[in-house]
Amino acid sequence: MSHPTIAHGPMTNPNDFRPGVYRHYKGNHYLALGLAREDETEELVVVYVRLYERAGVPMSTRRLKVWNEIVTDANGTTQPRFVFVGHQT
């Protein structure tokens, strides 16, 4: 399994973050609930829930700077790791 190439850029302003449904570059959808602060590092993390069936705990966190990364997939396509799809209704 190959891992994506990551282009590191400036961290997105936390005020620009929008809760809602996001599509991961591999195709799955997630509901981003909001931002939280990691207690030990004080880094901002996105709190989200996967919107597909899979064993295990459905809620996760991901560092905001990783959430906003630009990745290059195995086919050489460069794209955001997550793309905002819209608000959950």
Where on the chain are the PLM-derived regions?
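Mixed-charge, low-complexity intrinsically disordered regions
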Residues: S2-T89
